[in-house]
Amino acid sequence: METEHLKRLEAKEADHIPAILDEFNTKNADLLVFDSFRTDNLWHELWLAIFGILDDQRLSHLHTQCLNTVRILTRDEFSLQTNYIEQEVNTLLKLARIEAGSLKLPATPDELKQEEREEPQLEPSQAQSEVIAEALKCLCNLVYQSSDCRRQCLRQHCLDAILKRVASSMRHPCALEYYDMKLLFLLTALEPAARSRLQIDLNGLTYMTKWLDDKLGEDSVGEEQLNIICELLKVMFNVTSAPDKSPNEYEIQSLHLTGVLRELLLRFGDLATEKDRAVVTHAINLLTNISGSCLTELTLRCSNAELESHKEREQDNEKEKDTEAGAGAKPRECCSQCFEKRNVRSLDVLLRYLRQSLAQQEAEASSHELLSPVLTVLVKCARSDRVMRHYLRQEILPPLRDVSQRPEVGQELRNHLCRFLTLPAMILRDLSAELLFVLCKENVGRMIKYTGYGNAAGLFAKRGILDCRRVEGTDYSSDSEDSDTEEYKQQQQGINPVLGCVEPRSKSHLDDISEEQKEYEAMQLVNLIEQLRQGGIVKPAMIDKDGRPQPLEHILQLQEELPQQQLDQKRKT
């Protein structure tokens, strides 16, 4: 900026200020490197000149342009750290109308409505709303760049003011609501004290849940509203990451929140647009912070379940009741969206999201960790509720029919999860293994049936069940879930349990060699394995009494230990 222009800004020459600021803002709209502004103390002088205009109410018509300039200057982290800007931050808080002062936020949304009826406030004009939004943008930059600014915002109780504005019945422009949420997100993400105050002192989760519920109650939700909802969900994720409230109080809030998130999943679950998908993504991230006992709110008893039960009883009186369900039979549905008289549309949305994520991950080679939130939620659902586990098992592990291919081959959900069992990515591997194991009711034999022993060996080793012993301490319903189809039973004897499929018959290469040659090749193999062991490449192991692999001193120990181990296993069975 030219010296003459800077002097006119300092002198507050109103006739020249608009043109000067317009030229500066246009020229530096994408500026990120401020080396030229640090010579001759230009950054600091321009900063003071702009705030001189912002402090002058007679020049309020220029405040929007000035705040655009401030937003550009707040990108310079070095200058923010080396200059004392506390007074300027207070000015921005005042312009954004989030300086709380003696503000006291009511404990509940209902009390806030009562207060608004007793003391109605004037709605800001369009010009004032633009100034507020621009000031919030500047504060977002400052909060992101400077820890001192974050602490100053907390001292000025800006959390109280933002939450009160968000929860008020007064309608605000979308831009203002969006940057309110953006500022809250940055504060709660970067300042642990902000999370605690918002959750405990201000009862913020209750206010934000109510606001989210109100947003979902609107007839139409445009793109701007979807952006606001995404930011709100991100704030709620931060707040619920480390709950500090008492377990009972937090569970009550979580139950209500889960119910609202269920409605959100149902509304945007078609995943028709990228924005819909973004909303569902943030909702799933938030669900990972909810305890499993509260996730039962994702499914509700169907409205016509009682009527259907009455009809079923009448039908059962007219005909004999079957003693055994047919192979692969599905529970009767009371409507197209229900399973065992519970509405499971939200679970269907989660599975649809998982399928789309898997397809996107394969097409774009994106990070495996993008799948971990939805898998985490599915594991919690399967563990927390019998009906949800039954539905997920029906969708992920349907009755086996074609066992000619390995479990990891194919594009079904089971195939994808089986492939993940042997990934080096630990988080995704462990989540996939746990989901499959829970859907199998932690039954080792059933897990081998659906995944093959080779794919599940890592899980078995981790849990100490390599010897296929029964898992102790499991608490699952005892209802029969025998889902073997006729096709599976016909091929069952030919299934290789290690591979998890029928192994094609082929001529053995050992048939054409003599016994002496077989013995020679066997010793050669032993020697090669011993060389690998000595080089630290492999570690031969036996399964110890705890069901975990135990390294061997020498490969020949297998000859001594295996017969005894097999004998012990027969005695157990």
UniProtKB/Swiss-Prot annotation:
Disruption phenotype: RNAi-mediated knockdown results in a reduction in synapse number and reduced neurotransmitter release. Residues 308-324 have a biased composition (Basic and acidic residues). The keyword Coiled coil does not apply. GO terms for molecular function: G-protein alpha-subunit binding; guanyl-nucleotide exchange factor activity. GO terms for cellular component: cell cortex; cytoplasm; cytosol; type Ib terminal bouton; type Is terminal bouton. PANTHER family: SYNEMBRYN. Interacts with GDP-bound G(i)-alpha protein G-i-alpha-65A. Does not interact with G-alpha proteins when they are in complex with subunits beta and gamma. Interacts with Frq2 in a Ca(2+)-independent manner but does not interact with Frq1. Chaperone that specifically binds and folds some, but not all, nascent G alpha proteins prior to G protein heterotrimer formation, promoting their stability and activity. Also acts as a guanine nucleotide exchange factor (GEF) for G alpha proteins by stimulating exchange of bound GDP for free GTP. Plays a key role in asymmetric spindle positioning, a step for asymmetric cell division that generates cell diversity during development by activating G(i) alpha protein independently of G-protein coupled receptors. Required during gastrulation and sensory organ precursor (SOP) formation. This is Chaperone Ric-8. The lineage of its organism: Eukaryota, Metazoa, Ecdysozoa, Arthropoda, Hexapoda. The gene is ric8a.
